[in-house]
Amino acid sequence: MEVSGVVLRQIPCVSSGSVAGLRLVSEFSGNTRTVGFRTRRFRGIVCNNEFADKGHVNYYIEPTRCGEEKEKVKVMEKEKKALKKKAKVLKSLSKNLDMFSSIGFGLDPEAGLVGEIQTKTISEATEILVKQLEQLKAEEKILKKQRKEEKAKAKAMKKMTEMDSESSSSSESSDSDCDKGKVVDMSSLRNKAKPVLEPLQPEATVATLPRIQEDAISCKNTSEALQIALQTSTIFPSMANPGQTLKTVEAVSVVGLPLNRVEVCMGGKCKRSGGALLLDEFQRAMTGFEGSAVACKCMGKCRDGPNVRVVKETDAVMTDSVRTPSKTLCVGVGLQDVETIVTSFFDEECSREGLGSVSY
């Protein structure tokens, strides 16, 4: 039997210098034996306090990581995420396994038919529920609109009642206590030219209407012209329209008040629009005349205020012992109208000419 082999043995160094070592090589080939020696160089130099080999330096000269390794890391991370997602899906499926079996996700074909029927019924039920929800939403919208309309109506009614509360409540009381009498709008009179009533006024300025001017020219003196003008018209020429008729209501005299007086309205709007100042001005203007200026409650026409009622005693007799004073309501009276009203109703010459009994 042939045997072949190689025996290696390192020969130790003889000297400490750079001497090449010997390696014994034995070769066996059949029955013959040959021995050979080969030299080997040391990679390092043996010195004091140094390593004999510099192989440890290669540790610090290793190549850095390239981009392929980074890509591999990314791929691994993606795979981990995919595995996590699959695990979550499997976990959820395992939890809802009973529900799927009840719906009909089974291997049995009959169970599949039952599942289809169940899905149809579920879809129909969902459609019905959706329709009911839409109907409820529409009803809620209609109710909201109705509520808004009711609120708006309530607000409008509240405003109307607040505006009319003073006038309505005062008109009811004024109808029972005192009459309305004659009504004169002072604001319309101020917009038109008024003649100045003086005893020595020329004829042309007193008689403003054409017919009155013709009658006044035919008179002999100014007193006759003034009398004709006052009989055919009133002291307020803007109200001398033949088509204008105002109602006169007989009044009952108030106990404790003078028969000849000027009543100034102290209602809400009349008082705010200067009723107190108007009362003071009337009291000042009535100092030289028979009568007085007093305050009274609302007359029911505060919308056109401030208002003044002139009460003057007349010769008309209801019974043997009761006289009926005439009442005239002046609407929209200003401070500039005080002198005109006082002189028109309470001047002696005007009263003799019948100014207090003239219809407006």
Curated annotation (Swiss-Prot):
Pathway: Glycerolipid metabolism; triacylglycerol biosynthesis. Disruption phenotype: No visible phenotype under normal growth conditions. Transmembrane segments: none annotated. [2Fe-2S] cluster binds at C265, C270, C298, C302. CDD domains: TRX_Fd_family. It comes from the Eukaryota. The keyword Iron-sulfur applies. Residues 153-182 are annotated as: Disordered. One of its GO terms (molecular function) is metal ion binding. InterPro entries: Thioredoxin-like_sf. One of its GO terms (cellular component) is cytosol. It catalyses: an acyl-CoA + a 1,2-diacyl-sn-glycerol = a triacyl-sn-glycerol + CoA. GO terms for biological process: glycerol metabolic process; triglyceride biosynthetic process. Keywords: 2Fe-2S, Acyltransferase, Glycerol metabolism, Iron, Iron-sulfur, Lipid biosynthesis, Lipid metabolism, Metal-binding, Transferase. Its cofactor is [2Fe-2S] cluster. Its EC number is 2.3.1.20. Signal peptide: none annotated. Involved in triacylglycerol (TAG) biosynthesis. Catalyzes the acylation of the sn-3 hydroxy group of sn-1,2-diacylglycerol using acyl-CoA. May preferentially use linolenoyl-CoA as substrate and to a lesser extent linoleoyl-CoA. May contribute to the active recycling of linoleate and linolenate into TAG when seed oil breakdown is blocked. Belongs to the diacylglycerol acyltransferase family. This is Diacylglycerol O-acyltransferase 3. It comes from Arabidopsis thaliana (Mouse-ear cress).
